[in-house]
Curated annotation (Swiss-Prot):
Organism: Mus musculus (Mouse)
GO molecular function, one term: DNA-binding transcription activator activity, RNA polymerase II-specific
PTM text: Ubiquitinated by the BCR(KBTBD5) complex, leading to its subsequent degradation. Phosphorylation by E2F1-bound cyclin A-CDK2, in the S phase, inhibits E2F-mediated DNA binding and transactivation.
Principal location class: nucleus
Compositional bias per record (Basic residues), positions renumbered to this chain: 104-114
Protein name per the record: Transcription factor Dp-1
Subunit-level organization: Component of the E2F:DP transcription factor complex. Forms heterodimers with E2F family members. The complex can interact with hypophosphorylated retinoblastoma protein RB1 and related proteins (RBL1 and RBL2) that inhibit the E2F transactivation domain. This repression involves recruitment of histone deacetylase (HDAC). During the cell cycle, from mid-to-late G1 phase, RB family members become phosphorylated, detach from the DRTF1/E2F complex to render E2F transcriptionally active.
Length: 410
């Protein structure tokens, strides 16, 4: 048919007609589509022939390549208005399925807040506001927020969006952890803080350094206190054992004070009101004058059981004895304490007037096996484990129902 209409030459080339009525500089190329079966070889380049006057100047000879056409009969060739590429679109597809409409839809979705950047900001805000949270908590809240905003979405699309949101939340949490903005321990997520500049970071590190130095000092003080307690207890045990060997009998029961204990010291003229709970686990003392409280460790120190390490006045012989009472790893600390570097470890406090000092049974109950011979020298100051309770004399408070008055004075 094409040959009959003189559209194809005998050698199979395609004729191209140029409108002779237009100006020479604006040649118009007219392309006539031919059924693929009439063309022998696909991909063969066709050189068009021009018909017209010889004196007409044509700007450029056009070379047309025959594209690969699909085998389906219901397809048409669509040319992009922006690019020279050729796209094959089925006639059964809607116009929204074109690549340009898909790109618009993707950009619109990103603007609606479905991008990783937007999710990262949302996740960061929620973790910062909560302080401590979990992945499920953040993901559930974001799913609820976006589901409420998209009520018109179909159920199957909503399920897909929920999975997408949870995946985005998981990715955002990993990004924030990599940037050290949040920390994760098992299922618990904690807020650390946004990155700061170098000056602020240096200041924060200096504050953290001072805080850790203070903790180290506190730990050193606790260690030295425990070393003194161990030395004092072991010295007391050795002294009691020697006393039993010399007497060849155990001491009388009424001469033994069990550890731990406390001693309350006050004037003979002080009026003391002591109330004891029904279970005898709590004691309430009311004093009308100043008083002092000493614990067992302070009494042992004043008896010389700590070998003078508490004050830094330790002789070479006492140092040797003290080093033998502690493990090998603690011997350097004992030597350091003997040289006087223990200053400031123990707090020396004095008693004061009190009204309503409450003592628990743990301070008065029988504890470690050990016997103590009391010293005749009275103590005026206390360096106990805890600071002395301080209060002032005031009006007498009504006794609680669970206390029984005991008028005995110590």
């Amino acid at each position: 048919m094409a040959k009959d209409a003189s559209l194809i030459e005998a050698n199979g080339e395609l004729k191209v007609f140029i409108d002779q009525n237009l100006s020479p500089g604006k040649g118009v190329v007219s392309l006539v589509a031919v059924h693929p079966s009439t063309v022998n070889t696909l991909g063969k380049q066709l050189l068009p022939k021009t018909f017209g006057q010889s004196n007409v100047n044509i700007t450029q000879q056009v070379v047309i390549g025959t594209p690969q056409r699909p085998a389906a009969s219901n397809t048409i060739v669509v040319g992009s208005p922006h690019t020279p590429n050729t796209h094959f679109v089925s006639q059964n597809q809607t116009s929204d399925s074109s690549p340009w409409s898909a790109g618009k839809r993707n950009r619109k979705g990103e603007k609606n807040g479905k991008g990783l950047r937007h999710f990262s900001m949302k996740v960061c805000e929620k973790v910062q506001r909560k302080g401590t949270t979990s992945y499920n908590e953040v993901a559930d809240e974001l799913v609820a927020e976006f589901s409420a905003a998209d009520n018109h979405i179909l159920p199957n699309e909503s399920a897909y969006d929920q999975k997408n949101i949870r995946r985005r939340v998981y990715d955002a949490l990993n990004v924030l952890m990599a940037m050290n903005i949040i920390s994760k321990e098992k299922k618990e997520i904690k807020w650390i803080g946004l990155p700061t500049n170098s000056a602020q970071e240096c200041q924060n590190l200096e504050v953290e350094r001072q805080r850790r130095l203070e903790r180290i000092k506190q730990k050193q003080s606790q260690l030295q206190e425990l070393i003194l307690q161990q030395i004092a207890f072991k010295n007391l045990v050795q002294r009691n054992r020697q006393a039993e060997q010399q007497a060849r009998r155990p001491p009388p029961p009424n001469s033994v004070i069990h550890l731990p204990f406390i001693i309350v010291n006050t004037s003979r003229k002080t009026v003391i009101d002591c109330s004891i709970s029904n279970d005898k686990f709590e004691y309430l003392f009311n004093f009308d004058n100043t008083f002092e409280i000493h614990d067992d460790i302070e009494v042992l120190k004043r008896m010389g059981m700590a070998c003078g390490l508490e004050s830094g006045n330790c002789s070479a012989e006492d140092l040797k004895v003290a080093r033998s009472l502690v493990p090998k790893a603690l011997e350097p600390y004992v030597t350091e304490m003997a040289q006087g570097s223990i200053g400031g470890v123990f707090v020396t406090t004095t008693g004061s007037t009190s009204n309503g000092t409450r003592l628990s049974a743990s301070d008065l109950s029988n504890g470690a096996d050990g016997m103590l011979a009391t010293s005749s020298n009275g103590s005026q100051y206390s360096g106990s484990r805890v600071e002395t309770p301080v209060s002032y004399v005031g009006e007498d408070d009504d006794d609680d129902d669970d206390f029984n008055e005991n008028d005995e004075e110590d």
